[in-house]
């Protein structure tokens, strides 16, 4: 159960970093 919590926190942190970079510098591959 503890591993699930740690993985959730890790994914959440990586997700926040990814979205912050994504919205700060929008990729040009979409258009």
From Swiss-Prot:
Cysteine disulfide links: none
Annotated signal peptide: none
Taxonomic lineage: Eukaryota, Viridiplantae, Chlorophyta, core chlorophytes, Chlorophyceae
UniProt protein name: Photosystem II reaction center protein T
Main location: plastid
Pfam families for this protein: PsbT
Protein role: Found at the monomer-monomer interface of the photosystem II (PS II) dimer, plays a role in assembly and dimerization of PSII. PSII is a light-driven water plastoquinone oxidoreductase, using light energy to abstract electrons from H(2)O, generating a proton gradient subsequently used for ATP formation.
InterPro entries: PSII_PsbT, PSII_PsbT_sf
Record's subunit section: PSII is composed of 1 copy each of membrane proteins PsbA, PsbB, PsbC, PsbD, PsbE, PsbF, PsbH, PsbI, PsbJ, PsbK, PsbL, PsbM, PsbT, PsbY, PsbZ, Psb30/Ycf12, at least 3 peripheral proteins of the oxygen-evolving complex and a large number of cofactors. It forms dimeric complexes.
Subcellular location: Plastid, Chloroplast thylakoid membrane
TM region(s), chain numbering: 3-23
Membrane-protein topology: Single-pass membrane protein
Entry keyword annotation includes Secreted: no
